[in-house]
Curated annotation (Swiss-Prot):
Primary role: Probable ATP-dependent zinc metallopeptidase. Involved in the assembly and/or stability of the complexes I and V of the mitochondrial oxidative phosphorylation system.
Note describing how the cofactor binds: Binds 1 zinc ion per subunit.
Positions of the UniProt region annotated as Disordered: 93-129, 764-813
Compositional bias of kind Basic and acidic residues: 94-125, 764-790
Entries under SMART domains matching the protein: AAA
PANTHER family listed in its UniProt record: AFG3 LIKE MATRIX AAA PEPTIDASE SUBUNIT 2, ISOFORM A, ATP-DEPENDENT PROTEASE
Annotated residues for binding of Zn(2+): H592, H596, D668
Name assigned to this protein: ATP-dependent zinc metalloprotease FTSH 10, mitochondrial
Range of the transit peptide: 1-86
Chief site of localization: mitochondrion
Conditions for induction: By high light.
Keywords: ATP-binding, Hydrolase, Membrane, Metal-binding, Metalloprotease, Mitochondrion, Mitochondrion inner membrane, Nucleotide-binding, Protease, Transit peptide, Transmembrane, Transmembrane helix, Zinc
């Protein structure tokens, strides 16, 4: 692993190759005259060029001195990168010459490339100091690894032989071969021996293991060593041994005490500290790339911990090919008109200033998810000829205290520098929540500080004109009141789910990108009638799913059948035909869905049925019935009562025709309970409760009515649901045979449409005087629109009481 890191680090740049394979005259890397600071890149390379060549030759001489052969080295260092490092051959250049021979293909040359090459050389010369420091940073770890390897070899092949004191006394001291002794660090006695006894006789010459190390300033060679317990006992034993063999005290073996520093032991002692420092340095470098500062799309690279206070701003690219314009946004014409006024003011401010008008400081885009708030902001960026800065509300929040306000200041500072400009803050509720909620400190303090800084920047002493702030959220109810006041967000632009005309326009935009077998208008009219309550994101998902289904079935074009399957996929979930269901359960599901279909068919105010199926979908639905509701802004008591009866049709069919009830009606009962509680406690339909309204609040622990009133509401809801279920059971018993026929058809076909129900049940006894969404789905609605415009009489618009348009009703089992 060390060799791999070593080879990859040394082969990182072309400049390091010369450093590795340098030699000759330039290998004098320790020349003091060359340790001056380099003036340019060439000087820097020449200064470090011969360093590893010197190490390579030193290693080769070391191997030769130890008697190592090339085969031993190749077996020891089988790593190809290490062999390439110690090779004297220059490696191949990393360019296209390795793939295309020079004679067969030549790279094109032109003046532009030569100019860029000259420019790059100039930049290299200008940044010679940085390159020089980078070279040494890259070489630091490999040099340390080489030093560790060399020290391991030198330690592993120790020349000296360890002996005991008795062997020293009998073989060396008595033979007169001891020249002198060095005691290192009061622990090890190093014995330096002569080649012949002191009496110059060569009869008993002791041969040591290999060549010894010559002593400095004395005779003898260092060949043996032994450990001593203490200095006093060693001196006593040595003196007694010399007296025993009759050595004169003047001829005693000289003993020298030396203090030596073993560098690798010191390195091991400081290894934990060095490891901690290296970890801190590595963490600091990682933080430079991962914390704060400008980054991401449109930001600057190389952000560091010291730039953490800078906002992560995304600037709109004026030259982008995928720009979005206002013509690409549909279904929200009123909101689009409001936003376009900001763009027109920034482009032509004099027109408004002459009239004495001031541009609003900001606009808050409010609406359910998927309605196109961010898409409208992208269109603003594409249409406006002024700088557009976008950021997410969560980008202001960080683990460090004070980062949020600093990023707010940095954001507005950059916006003022390029004024007139537009700032878009997506999901502003991340920092704009009302202050003081819960009374807790901690993370709320940092968020409130960020909010306070945003309030000051939008409308404070240092506020300057020319900066417009747009923000998007789907939770305007939790925003701080100071943020919503005029002077900061002057306008609140509500973007609701599109109506049938808006869905038609949105479908036409997305259908233009799909290969169809008819014109886009043919599908857009029918699909708009089929998808009430769908937002723009849902419509885009339906179109994409239809294209995917067509590709899955190897279709040349996308047809209406593919769109039907896509809508079923979006509403009901993934189709699961392979789910194991028993015959009894399948029969129960069929009668349950048949009860829904028959009950809705014979109820005047029930929504027309589109289709019913017993194919399992999603995670829990064993079947469902799909209706095409009309987008009524107002609902009457009779309409809600009929819808309650229709929802209870499945449970009534199980009881009447099968004779037992199942858990399949759990979702139906949940809808009925919620609907009935709304009629009694919210809409004021109950005579017992009176004209009171208790809408559901977030605080469920306290209720705005007494326990007695709550008991009355519960009793009234139970009574209303009982009446609805009794009426539904009577209806199912009256049409028992037809319910059974439809159930058997479902078991046979699995999917029934309205035409199949008409054959069994006949025409629906109730016909609406107005065009329904189902009629628009069958034949389009352009002609009916023209007729209604001729006969229409202007009336005062009725104010909506907060009743949302009805979505497609899916009744899972």
């Amino acid at each position: 692993m060390i060799f791999s890191k070593l080879g990859s680090s040394l082969a990182r740049s072309s400049r390091s190759k010369g450093f590795v394979y340098g030699g000759g005259v330039r290998s004098a890397v320790f020349n003091q005259g060359r340790l001056r600071a380099p003036q340019n890149l060439e000087a820097a390379v020449n200064q470090v060029d011969g360093g590893l060549g010197f190490l390579r030759r030193h290693f080769a001489s070391f191997a030769a001195r130890k008697g190592l052969e090339a085969g031993d080295l190749s077996r020891a260092f089988a790593n190809p990168r290490l062999r390439r490092f110690f090779s004297s051959q220059t490696p191949k250049k990393k360019n296209y010459e390795n793939y295309y021979p020079k004679d067969s293909k030549k790279a094109p040359k032109n003046e532009q490339k030569s100019e860029s090459r000259d420019g790059s050389k100039k930049n290299e010369n200008e940044n010679a100091g940085d390159a020089f420091s980078n070279e040494y940073q890259n070489m630091l770890i490999p040099l340390m690894a080489i030093a560790l390897i060399l020290s391991t070899f030198s330690l592993g092949s120790r020349e000296q032989q360890q002996i005991s004191f008795q062997e020293f006394k009998n073989k060396l001291l008595e033979a007169g071969l001891v020249d002198h002794i060095d005691v290192s660090n009061k622990e090890v006695a190093k014995v330096y021996v002569r080649s012949s006894p002191k009496s110059q006789t060569t009869e008993e010459v002791v041969q040591g293991p290999g060549n010894g190390v010559p002593a400095k300033g004395r005779g003898g060679q260092y060949k043996y060593y032994f450990n001593i317990g203490s200095v006093e006992s060693f001196e006593e034993k040595l003196e007694e041994a010399q007296e025993a063999i009759g050595v004169n005290s003047h001829d005693f073996v000289p003993v020298t005490y030396v203090s030596e520093t073993i560098w690798y032991q010191e390195l091991l002692r400081f290894a934990p500290t060095l490891l901690l420092v290296a970890t801190l340095i590595f963490g600091a470098r990682r933080m430079q790339g991962g914390l704060g500062g400008l980054g991401g799309p449109g930001g600057k690279a190389g952000r560091g911990i010291f730039n953490i206070g800078k906002a992560q701003i995304t600037r709109a690219d004026k030259n982008s090919k995928n720009k979005i314009y206002f013509k690409d946004v549909a279904g929200c014409e009123e909101a689009k008109q409001e936003i376009m006024e900001f763009v027109h003011f920034l482009q032509n401010p004099k027109k408004y200033e002459d009239l004495g008008a001031k541009i609003p400081k900001g606009a808050l885009l409010v609406g359910p998810p998927g309605t196109g708030k961010t898409l409208l902001a992208k269109a603003t960026a594409g249409e406006s000829a002024v700088p557009f800065l976008s950021i997410s509300g969560s980008d202001f929040m960080e683990m460090f205290v004070g980062v949020g306000p600093s990023r707010v200041r940095n954001l507005f500072q950059e916006a003022r520098q390029c004024a007139p400009s537009i700032i878009f803050i997506d999901e502003i509720d991340a920092i704009g929540r009302a202050r003081g909620r819960g009374g807790f400190s901690g993370g709320n303090d940092e968020r409130e500080s960020t909010l306070n800084q945003l309030l000051v920047e939008m409308d404070g002493f240092g506020t300057t004109a020319g900066v417009v702030v747009l923000a998007g959220t789907n939770r305007p109810d939790i925003l701080d009141k100071a943020l919503l006041r005029p002077g900061r967000f002057d306008r609140q632009i509500t973007i609701d789910k599109p109506d049938i005309k808006g869905r038609d326009q949105i479908f036409q935009i997305y259908l233009k990108k799909i290969k169809l077998d008819h014109e886009p208008s043919y599908y857009s009219q029918r699909l708009a009638a089929l998808t009430p309550g769908f937002a723009g994101a849902d419509i885009a998902n339906v179109c994409n799913e239809a294209a995917l289904i067509a590709a899955r079935h190897e279709g040349a074009t996308v047809t209406m059948a593919h769109f039907d399957s896509a809508i079923d996929r979006v509403i009901g979930g993934l189709e699961k035909k392979n789910r194991v269901i028993s015959k009894l359960e399948r029969r129960t599901v069929a009668y349950h869905e048949s009860g829904h279909a028959v009950a809705g068919w014979f109820l005047e105010h029930a929504e027309p049925l589109l289709k019913v199926t017993i194919v399992p979908r999603g995670t829990a639905a064993l079947g469902f019935a799909q209706y095409v509701p009309n987008e009524n802004l107002l609902m009457t008591k009779e309409q809600l009562f009929d819808m309650t009866c229709m929802t209870l049709g499945g449970r009534a069919a199980e009881q009447v025709l099968i004779g037992r009830i199942s858990t399949g009606a759990q979702n139906d009962l949940e809808k009925v309970t919620k609907m009935t509680y709304a009629q009694v406690a919210v809409y004021g339909f109950s005579d017992k409760i009176g004209l009171l309204s208790f809408p559901q609040r977030e605080d469920e622990f306290s209720k705005p009515y007494s326990n007695r009133t709550g008991a009355m509401i519960d009793e009234e809801v139970r009574e209303w649901v009982g009446k609805a279920y009794k009426r539904t059971v009577e209806l199912i018993e009256e049409h028992k045979e037809q319910v059974a026929q439809i159930a058997e058809l479902l078991l046979e076909k699995e999917v029934l449409h309205q035409d199949d129900l008409t054959k069994v049940l006949g025409e629906r006894p109730f016909k609406s005087g107005e065009t329904t969404n189902y009629d628009r789905f069958k034949s389009g609605f352009e002609e009916s629109e023209k007729e209604s415009q001729k006969e229409s009489v202007p009336v005062k618009p009725v104010e909506d009481d907060g009743i949302p348009p009805l979505e497609p009703q899916v009744v899972p089992t």
